Amino acid sequence: MSEVTTAEFNEDGVYLRKVRSFVLREGRLTTGQAKALESFWPTMGLDYSPQAINFTEVFGREADTVLEIGFGMGASLVEMAANAPELNFIGVEVHKPGVGACLGEAGNAGISNLRVYHHDAVEVLENAIPDSSLARVQLFFPDPWHKKRHHKRRIVQPEFVELLRRKLKIGGVFHMATDWENYAEHMLEVMSAAPGYQNQSDTQTYVPRPDHRPLTKFENRGQRLGHGVWDLMFERVE
């Protein structure tokens, strides 16, 4: 599970400035991850700056763009990019070994429709992603911060989902997945109250795992043990 951001939120879901140093997320790189960063960052890495990027310039084409927040080691993100060459993918991850692993897998597979940030997700969204530009935002298995006193660290909060709404196109979708039922309920509560979104579930709750989200090894194992996974998909409608 990825912490995806160094942000913290208050009880009303208002984003507070960073509370921990980004440097703490560097982590220890394997030799392979270090080589991947050296080899593939020049072509696939996006250096953060507080100016909005131009997707057409970044990818060399016009295509719908999907952004994933906190991709972990990147295996499912690389698989999605390989399975949907017609889409652009941007991954954001604060854990450097994960960035190296993702770049290595994508680079060695010849993936050309994926770019990666090694930075805080909230800052990337606030400053580097143009408004009304994303076809989909993905948040898969974020840290659930299961202790009640840590719930303010959960990334799905009212102000954050309003930030995402600004970045999604009309018709764009925010897709979440979690294996913590309490966090799924929290996500559903926050999203159902958020203005400008429509739940894509017929029951106004959860949706079956869509084909575009790969089934992870962790998830496969959990399902055999009877563990649940909850997917939520909310469309920006205004």
From Swiss-Prot:
One GO CC annotation: tRNA methyltransferase complex
UniProt pathway annotation: tRNA modification; N(7)-methylguanine-tRNA biosynthesis
PROSITE patterns per the UniProt record, alphabetical: SAM_MT_TRMB (PS51625)
Catalytic activity: guanosine(46) in tRNA + S-adenosyl-L-methionine = N(7)-methylguanosine(46) in tRNA + S-adenosyl-L-homocysteine
Active site: 143
InterPro entries given in the database record: SAM-dependent_MTases_sf, tRNA_(Gua-N-7)_MeTrfase_Trmb, tRNA_methyltr_TrmB_bact
Keyword tRNA processing: yes
Enzyme class of the recorded protein, top EC level: transferase
EC number: 2.1.1.33
Keywords: Methyltransferase, S-adenosyl-L-methionine, Transferase, tRNA processing
Any one GO molecular-function label of the UniProt entry: tRNA (guanine(46)-N7)-methyltransferase activity
Pfam families: Methyltransf_4
Binding sites annotated in the UniProt record for S-adenosyl-L-methionine: 68, 93, 120, 143
Domain of life: Bacteria
Binding positions (substrate): 147, 179, 216-219
NCBIfam families xrefs: tRNA (guanosine(46)-N7)-methyltransferase TrmB
Family according to the record: Belongs to the class I-like SAM-binding methyltransferase superfamily. TrmB family.
Function: Catalyzes the formation of N(7)-methylguanine at position 46 (m7G46) in tRNA.
Protein name, entry field: tRNA (guanine-N(7)-)-methyltransferase
